Amino acid sequence: MKLNMGKRELELDGKYLGRLREANDLMGNPEALRARMQEDGYLLIRRLHDPEKVKAVRRVLIDNLAANGQIDCSHPLDEAWIAPGARGAFMGGAKAVTHSPEFLDVVEAPELMQFFSDFLGGPSLTYNYKWLRAVGAGDFTGAHYDVVYMGRGTRNLYTVWTPLGDVPFNKGPLAILEGSQHFERVKATYGQMDVDRDHVTGWFSNDPLELIEQYGGRWLT
């Protein structure tokens, strides 16, 4: 299977693109989860969220996008067809949708907060600011570290990528560059940036193969 990533076409399970390793078998064992995080730099956990809560916030998001002309309403609304010419939307910060009860029921769910309290070994907190994006067909988010967007107050943080619905390969799932948590030179330079303070976009590269050729690893999805 070939998948598009930016302007590149990559073969799944090939030289440049593999699959993320699941961590569900480690649930309930914080020590093992911490060791896996240290090893892989991520934790892929399926079914952590209540599916009904995810469906509820998806409906709120689709209604919001439709009201702003981002959805093709000639198709069933729950299928969320992108309107011709629509390029997606960023709805972070003070946008009402990121403070709706349905959205907060997912991203601040008791089960999620408890997971991090167990993982961190103490009470966990979350930012009031949330980063919510809808990315248009054929677009992608360039390679980046999340910390350049959200690490100004503290770097002792973890981010949670939460798809609001099923995301098969053809609908743009997350991709992580294998081993990138150990790219010390990148962490000491680009990783010290702050997008607001330094007035930069936050992307390190929009070419997925450039990073592999320079630093090694492969993309995992």
Name what the model sees in each region:
Residues 2-40, 46-143, 149-152:
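Non-heme Fe(II)-dependent double-stranded beta-helix
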Residues 30, 109-113, 157, 167, ...:
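A structural signal for well-ordered alpha-helical scaffolds and beta->alpha junctions
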Residues 42-44, 159-163, 217-219:
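Conserved hydrophobic/aromatic beta-strand scaffold that supports enzyme active sites
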Residues 47-49, 164-168, 179-181:
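Short loop segments at secondary-structure junctions
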Residues 99, 127-128, 156, 160, ...:
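Residues that flank catalytic or metal-binding motifs in active/ligand-binding sites
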Residues 119, 150-169, 205:
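Short, conserved beta-strand element in jelly-roll/cupin
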Residues 131, 145-147, 162-166, 178:
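Short, structured patches in soluble enzyme cores that scaffold and shape functional sites
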Residues 170-221:
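Double-stranded beta-helix
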